Amino acid sequence: MTETRFSKDHEWVRLDGDVATVGITDHAQSALGDVVFVELPETGRHVDAGEACAVVESVKAASDVYAPLAGTVTEANGALADDPGMVNAQAESGAWFFRMTLDDRAAFDALLTADDYQAFLATL
């Protein structure tokens, strides 16, 4: 069963078994504008929760993408390098940034639910 959670840094995490898929939220891509470049983390890299591990550049700004959880990157979405505009079109589906195995499954449960994330957005 897959479940999606969110960070206050506007990343989403979809957990499927032991694998977490990470991307940026629709809110984040909308704030960035047209995405023109994406830099992804290397496979095999260990990241800590809150660590900047990817970069997304738009016509407006460049922004770090933070690891919402600690773990090891197992795959990066190379399609984003060829077509960074996917981030705008499919932010919370096909335009995932990387997949990782988690150091601590319980940390996933501490992230925001969809309802909690929407409530957080309302405070911005």
Curated annotation (Swiss-Prot):
Q: Which CDD domains match?
A: GCS_H (cd06848)
- Gene Ontology cellular component terms for the protein in this record: cytosol; glycine cleavage complex
Question: According to the UniProt record, which cysteines are disulfide-bonded?
Answer: none
The Lipoyl-binding domain sits at 19-101
Under the heading PROSITE patterns, the entry gives:
BIOTINYL_LIPOYL, LIPOYL
UniProt cross-references to SUPFAM superfamilies, sorted A to Z: Single hybrid motif
Instruction: Output one GO BP term.
Output: glycine decarboxylation via glycine cleavage system
Q: Which Gene3D superfamilies match?
A: 2.40.50.100
Where N6-lipoyllysine occurs, the residues are 60
Q: Which cofactor does it need?
A: (R)-lipoate
Free-text cofactor note: Binds 1 lipoyl cofactor covalently.
- Keywords for the protein's UniProt record, in alphabetical order: Lipoyl
Question: NCBIfam families from the entry?
Answer: gcvH, PRK01202.1
Q: What does this protein do?
A: The glycine cleavage system catalyzes the degradation of glycine. The H protein shuttles the methylamine group of glycine from the P protein to the T protein.
Give the quaternary structure.
The glycine cleavage system is composed of four proteins: P, T, L and H.
Query: Which family does this protein fall into?
Result: Belongs to the GcvH family.
Tell me the protein's name.
Glycine cleavage system H protein
The primary gene name is gcvH
